[in-house]
Each structure stands twice: as structure tokens, then as C-alpha cells.
Amino acid sequence: LKIIELGSGNGRDSVYFAKQKLNVVAIDQSISGVDIEKKNLLDEDNNYLHLLAKDFVYEDYSKYGSIDAFYSRFTLHSITKIDEEILLPNIYNNLNSGGLFCIEVRTTKDPLFGKGELCEENTFINNNHKRRFIDTDKFRKKVADIGFRELYFVEKNNLSIYKNDNPVLMRLILEK
């Protein structure tokens, strides 16, 4: 099984996958956080985690061979709508038949939506943090038009509480 994590951040999820003996390629513009997490892996598990400092939007995924899953947790909010238009077909075209695209992202129903400075559609800068909030209806139609089949969808809070933040998230599992 090969998983590509888009925007791996500190690498927590990629490290978890590697501990489960799943091959994971963790892509982030900065891999310094993942390097710290990777030190917690046993030597035998280190072979399952591959770190790449790249822009996941413009990556050529055809060079990875067989890809079983793409995983995006709190990353689609960090790219522009134009980048999303490039990324989604790229994922679909490079995913194995029957492969999965797993997404967790803040939506336009999130309490932070509309707070801060509007810089483009559904995108706000609040406390020096830029977020693009996803309109779930439009996004689900877009991925269906690309060819994905929806296996699971939920949009609600209480999915990923962190300190005082209880965001409204979309969790979506798509199949090619």
C-alpha cells in the first residue's frame, strides 16, 4: 500500500502510517517538522516513511508508480482555488483504480469563516493565518465531475478539537 500525504506538517499522521507498515510519502514545503517526528520511529519503520520538501500542488505523481491513497488533512485550506483546479485532476489521474482520496478540511460553516481580512473567495487572513474555507456542495460536485465516487461524507464539529478550537470540518472519502 502506498499513501501520499499532501502537506504533512509535523508528520504525525505519516509517522502513524509508517508504524502500521504502510509506505507513505510525506510531502510538505518544509520537512523539518517531519524530521523531528521521524526520530520517534523504530529503525525498521523508518523504511516506510519517505520525506519530500516540495509543493504538493505541482508535483508529478506519475513518477511514484502505483498510488493507493492520497491523504489530505487540514491542507486544502492552504491552497488557492486555482491550485485546487490543478491538484484534483492530478490526484485522480495518478491514483490507482479503486484508490482512495481522504480529505479533512474546514468548511464555510466553520465559526472562523468570515472573520479577518477577505483576500479571495472564501479565503480570510485571521491572526496572521490564511485559510480558504471549502463550500462542501461545490466541492463534492467538482470531485464527482472529475470522476470520483463518494464513499463517505460528514460535515460537523466535534471531529478534531484542539484546545479551544472546535472547527466545522468536512470529512470526505472518495474512490477512483
Where are these regions (language model features)?
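Class I (Rossmann-like) S-adenosyl-L-methionine-dependent methyltransferase catalytic domain
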Residues: 1-49, 53-63, 83-86, 100-175
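A conserved beta-strand element that flanks and buttresses the S-adenosyl-L-methionine
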Residues: 71
